[in-house]
Amino acid sequence: MSKLNIDQKSVRALFSEKKADFLIPDYQRPYAWGEKECQTLWDDLFLFAFPDNDCDKFNSDSDEYFLGPIVTFKNDAGKMEIIDGQQRLTTLMLLLRAFYEKYGSMKNDKAVKTSKFIEQCIWKTDEFGDPDKSALKIDSEVATDKEKDEFLNILKTGTLSDCEKSSYANNYRFFQQKIVDFLNTYPDWFSFFPIRIMNNCILLPIEAESQDTALRIFSTLNDRGKPLSDADIFKAQFYKYYSAKGKREVFIQKWKDLEVLCDSIFHPITGTPMDELFTRYMYYERAKQGIKSSTTEALRKFYERNAYSLLKNDQTFENLINLADFWNDVQNQNVERFSDRILRRLFVLNYAPNGMWTY
């Protein structure tokens, strides 16, 4: 039986641990939270920290707010690779950095203590608790180089240029403005908000002993809660397969290129463009396997057969790329690929009452 380390911790307890060294791996989804999610988080945290809009109604000994799980495993480099929870963890880091940027310049005792606590959450520290501001406690490999640089620069310096427009930058600006508004509206409460977030907001870190175990937990949690796309699960399986073959970097680049292509081709009502590609490929595989049943099983159920064996060979991934290229040529009416007769038929099919012909 796989071993799990599960122990709920406050934001401060988790982030300020000496061993805290988080990595968002490159097979994860890009950071996707926008202003809507940040506004919801801010509102929820404010209502928790100041019940009934009253600072004195908060009980620091017993009040807790659950932020959700963080699923990790320790990789070969000793970093805690985040399998689930990267969106909230990244956003919390941006929020704490925005608080630090504002409170770090204040000289009263409470502000100084608050800044010290935030430092220990964002940066690695020496044995005296002093931060090494060149050594962050989180790194990300999932975004483009520019986005990654923006994220790391925000955490290191707390500054932004006008040309920085990533989700990291936009959300950091959002939190900066919310903090300014908060201090102007509730100047007497300024020292309580970040402390209550760090000390009384709770995360559930789940440390698995291996990537396989972490991925199973990741899939289970997201089946029951807010689901990830099926393609995210499939991507993780491909990632493991190609990493074992020493082709990790090649796969990551091909996957990113495939995502860009699918985004331009497919516009499904439900699911993601990559989900749509996997759906169309599923019908190809069903036909190849001689499956004639009119009942179609769920996409993830189809691919997870025999421990995702279909996703553990080079041919499947190459077939997916070829299939995307085919539909790109269909969309662009590639005359080098299709005869006039075929193009006329495809034109007519585009006016079909439903899209079943694409499968």
Can you annotate each of these PLM segments?
Residues F46-D54, Y100-G104, I179, Y241-S243:
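Short regulatory "switch" loops immediately downstream of catalytic or recognition motifs
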Residues Q28-Y31, E37, L45, A49, ...:
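Short, flexible loop/turn elements at secondary-structure junctions
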Residues M1, Y31-W42, Q86-L89, K165, ...:
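Generic detection of long, well-ordered alpha-helical segments
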Residues D56-K57, D63, Y103-L136:
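Flexible phosphate/Mg2+-sensing switch loops adjacent to catalytic phosphate-binding sites
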